[in-house]
């Protein structure tokens, strides 16, 4: 039986920390579906379509990873994909409280689905998409914290709009 896991997130934009979790998940599961959330509560820098394309390019070297997007409850999406696992990265203890609540409700709504927490590698423990956007907004070099395709996209995004200094 094929083990399928879903790795959900906003990925606005995808960082090397995200890729670290995705790669490590792909080492454990037969198939990892990286699922971009349509989050109406956030105003994204990149559209869902742009994030899907950036993720496809950033993960093309990982054969057992597919990229998709979803609306609604994560657990419904996971069941639809016949996955048995959710992969979540944890940077710090501060992430754990929210992730534990989410895992608990997902377990209640989908008793057959397990949530796997992966600690972010130390070199990425400070990294978030929000920090990346803040640094990139001021046209600082982000090439050591995001995949090259994302660094190019950020540069294009911020050079085409007024700088907020």
UniProtKB/Swiss-Prot annotation:
GO biological process: coenzyme A biosynthetic process
Site feature: Transition state stabilizer: 18
Catalysed reaction equations from the record: (R)-4'-phosphopantetheine + ATP + H(+) = 3'-dephospho-CoA + diphosphate
Stored Gene3D superfamilies: HUPs
Cellular component annotations (GO), alphabetically ordered: cytoplasm
Keyword terms, alphabetized: ATP-binding, Coenzyme A biosynthesis, Cytoplasm, Magnesium, Nucleotide-binding, Nucleotidyltransferase, Transferase
InterPro entries in alphabetical order: Cyt_trans-like, PPAT, Rossmann-like_a/b/a_fold
Record-listed substrate binding positions: 10, 42, 74, 88
GO terms of molecular function: ATP binding; pantetheine-phosphate adenylyltransferase activity
Pfam families: CTP_transf_like (PF01467)
EC number: 2.7.7.3
Organism domain of life: Bacteria
Chief location of this protein within or outside the cell: cytoplasm
Family: Belongs to the bacterial CoaD family.
UniProt protein name: Phosphopantetheine adenylyltransferase
């Amino acid at each position: 039986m094929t083990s399928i896991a879903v790795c959900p997130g906003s990925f606005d934009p995808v960082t090397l920390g995200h890729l670290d979790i995705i790669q490590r998940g792909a080492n454990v599961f037969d198939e990892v579906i990286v699922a971009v959330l349509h989050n109406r509560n956030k105003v994204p820098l990149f559209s869902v379509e742009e994030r899907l394309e950036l993720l496809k390019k950033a993960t093309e070297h990982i054969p057992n990873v597919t990229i998709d997007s979803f609306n609604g409850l994560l657990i419904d999406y996971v069941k639809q994909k016949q996955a048995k696992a959710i992969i979540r990265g944890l940077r710090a203890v501060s992430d754990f409280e929210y992730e534990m609540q989410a895992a608990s409700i997902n377990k209640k709504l989908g008793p057959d689905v397990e949530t796997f927490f992966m600690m972010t590698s130390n070199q990425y423990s400070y990294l978030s998409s929000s920090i990346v956007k803040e640094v990139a907004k001021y046209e600082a070099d982000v090439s050591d914290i995001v995949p090259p395709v994302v660094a190019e996209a950020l540069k294009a995004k911020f050079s085409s709009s007024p700088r907020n200094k």
